[in-house]
Amino acid sequence: MWPFRRKTPDLPPIPNTRTEYPYGLFVCTEAGFFLIREKGRYRIPTIRVMASWSAPSVQSSEDAVKHLPILGKIGFRDGSIIQDFSNQKTYLVSRNKKRHITSPDVFDRFGLNKELITVVSHEEANLHEDGEVLS
């Protein structure tokens, strides 16, 4: 045994009975990630979508949240820059809509970092409706 090894803290137990989570909390269950809202929860369909929110999540169980209906899916966070892998189109997510970027000058005009582009599947890009074109 190493004399300088730190003890890892014990994790709190995962709730398995009905739990009233507060609004806006991200919860991870065996069925995936969810965002808690007033009348239910929204499914976060992929890890890439979850990563765009840069939010911590708490561990839970389906038994703890089964009283909350699944109201739909949630897409990428506003301000995310995504690129559809199937057609190479780049979008800025704004007001929950994907705005097609048709000119590289848009990045300079708004101070956007091209290194923050997240390559996504066509299905992930279609979580958002089309918005106005940015050119």
For the regions a protein language model found, what residue spans apply to each?
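Short, surface-exposed polybasic-aromatic patches that bind anionic ligands, especially phosphate groups
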Residues: W2-S135
